[in-house]
């Protein structure tokens, strides 16, 4: 009984503060300038980003800085295609600003090498074009540009473990500045190659990433990182890849906490039901493995979310067309056991919901389906997590309770180990309590003068914010 009284005594002030702050938040939304509201949300403690592709989260500027610094790229040299020769061979992708490593460059014919220039030798105009080629920043760019061109352009940057590790730290630093506590990102250990082009064993790569995360600059960000391994379901060997990654994650549960499946759904290869038998086979061989799977990232109705739940997923990535499947929608509303990972800016830029006012997010949120906000491929959107929060607040008039529950959901439904999750949740609640106390007074927004948001191209193009780039 004494323990219960103590717990209630600790919890009651938090509840009172939250209740008091609800009215305060409504006043802030009514009276603050757009820039002040954005700054307030930038300073807001946030939980986790649990739908995140590390390769897509890295800003072009971070890629360039690491790839051109021998101290950060493991002594490698990167080249990018600046024009095409007349003897390009059939089957070779004609992708301007496709980036390759020195080992690949040295295997090209002299004519092939003539198409490429070192990243360090680009003119100012070429460098800017290279940077812009790695993000959606122009009218008309959308799904086709993203899937067919941007990923191939980034090319072999993803193979260099030094570059990936260093840009991961830059990503963590940016998240830490926004008040994020947990990043659950999709990144494997199977595709790294050394400077000779030889495959790095997954065990070696996993240890390298683990050691890098233990360094002081990584720890100083205040961001806890865990990985998901991701199967590209459209590949011919997707079933084999699924089995291999399932076994890998089972053997590396300290850092890899779950498994994902990604890839465009708009063909028969994206049909989740074709993997049902394989998942059931794997569950007969391995202990429970947490699954978060992309589903419902489609224009029209289908049953992909339902079929993905049958694979064993406890989290759904995107779920845009879930609203067109009433039976599955009702199931998620009533059970409240499955989290839908919402990616507003991604869904807008990839044209699944060009008009975000029509996004099903508020319907899910306000009918009891657990949801959270995430960035998906923030580097390629040239955005950040605060952009997602600002979009949600200004488009759907979120209440304070809804706003804080989004962060809470991201941690509660994370795949972090129970002890880690409990610590993250406790830290989040304490940070929110301190935040509400700081901004409860009517004149408290004056203290936002000490907050310096860092925004990127998306915020500038969408809202015209004059914050630092």
PLM-predicted stretches and their roles:
Residues 1-4:
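Positively charged n-region of N-terminal signal peptides that target proteins for export
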Residues 6-15:
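Bacterial N-terminal signal peptides
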Residues 19-291, 297-315, 321-338, 343-469:
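Metal-cofactor-binding active-site regions of metalloenzymes
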